[in-house]
């Protein structure tokens, strides 16, 4: 019995020593690694910061789709904003070619990119507040920090992977519709959004439902991408989507950022798991 107790005490002493090393050394090593990764992620957003001068660089992306050649164009991305959009639309019925582009005095902010970058900056701020001189006293303190960092990283990732669901009236009311010259025809709606590592542009062609129409009018709810047949009211008119054209382009640095988010979340979870291993030995006391 005495031997077993001595062995248990010795084992506990070893575990306590390992845990102190984890708190005082390995935790800070992981925090440094996380900061380095997230700084790289932040740089991928190519926005001007305190250490950079001038506007963000412009990048041109050709829109394409394997399913349609009705829409072609080029989008110019500058940091978190579309600084130019040059779009050609071939009308399905008569093959008439429509061309429209952003007015030169206009830019369209991509809120998804801006929000994702802000969440990354917040995660970096949380990590920087626990520099090498800070002494973690409990595992619970580390878990709390990891949870806070993971929350910001999850929100950053979700902003890029989960586009907003919008109703057709919300798209119609969007300022994006008024960005173009010449002015978009009243039977066209345009939406732009980020989905994973892609910048997507959707053009909706509409037709008016006549008061004598026998169709059962059912307004469509919110969606990332509406289908032909979706209906909505706008002003005094009832409208229906007749054609949907979606084109997209891959943004390489968004893919990089998503990879950095995934790696960072894995590092956070691994550190949490190591802390939790010790908790099973100290279930009756704070760890």
From Swiss-Prot:
Subcellular compartments: Nucleus envelope; Presynapse; Cell projection, Axon; Perikaryon
Alphabetical keyword list: Acetylation, Cell projection, Cytoplasmic vesicle, Nucleus, Synapse
Positions of modified residues (N-acetylalanine): 2
Signal peptide residues on this chain, from the entry's feature table: none
PANTHER family assigned to the protein according to its UniProt record, in alphabetical order: LEUCINE ZIPPER CONTAINING TRANSCRIPTION FACTOR LZF1 (PTHR13618), PROTEIN ROGDI HOMOLOG (PTHR13618:SF1)
Complex formation: Monomer.
Family membership noted in the UniProt record: Belongs to the rogdi family.
Name of this protein: Protein rogdi homolog
Organism of derivation: Rattus norvegicus
Gene of this entry: Rogdi
């Amino acid at each position: 019995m005495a031997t077993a107790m001595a062995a248990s005490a010795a084992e506990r002493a070893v575990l306590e020593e390992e845990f102190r090393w984890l708190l005082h050394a390995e935790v800070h090593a992981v925090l440094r690694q996380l900061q380095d990764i997230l700084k790289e992620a932040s740089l991928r957003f190519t926005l001007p910061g305190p250490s950079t001068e001038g506007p963000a660089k412009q990048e041109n992306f050709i829109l394409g789709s394997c399913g349609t050649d009705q829409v072609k164009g080029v989008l110019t991305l500058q940091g978190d904003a579309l600084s130019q959009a040059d779009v050609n639309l071939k009308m399905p019925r008569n093959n008439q070619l429509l061309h429209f582009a952003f007015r030169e005095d206009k830019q369209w902010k991509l809120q998804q990119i801006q929000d994702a970058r802000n969440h990354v900056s917040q995660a970096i701020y949380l990590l920087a507040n626990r520099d090498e001189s800070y002494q973690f006293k409990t595992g619970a303190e580390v878990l709390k920090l990891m949870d806070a960092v993971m929350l910001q990283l999850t929100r950053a990732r979700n902003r890029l992977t989960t586009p907003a669901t919008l109703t057709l009236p919300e798209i119609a009311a969007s300022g994006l519709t008024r960005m173009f010259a010449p002015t978009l025809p009243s039977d066209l709606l345009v939406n732009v959004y980020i989905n994973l590592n892609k910048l997507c542009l959707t053009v909706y062609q509409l037709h008016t439902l006549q008061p004598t129409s026998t169709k059962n009018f059912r307004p469509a709810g919110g969606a990332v991408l509406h289908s032909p047949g979706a209906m909505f009211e706008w002003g005094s008119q009832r409208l229906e989507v007749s054609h949907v054209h979606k084109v997209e382009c891959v943004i390489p640095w968004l893919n990089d950022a998503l990879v950095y988010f995934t790696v960072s979340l894995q590092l956070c979870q691994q550190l949490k798991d190591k802390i939790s291993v010790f908790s099973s030995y100290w279930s009756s006391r704070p760890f």
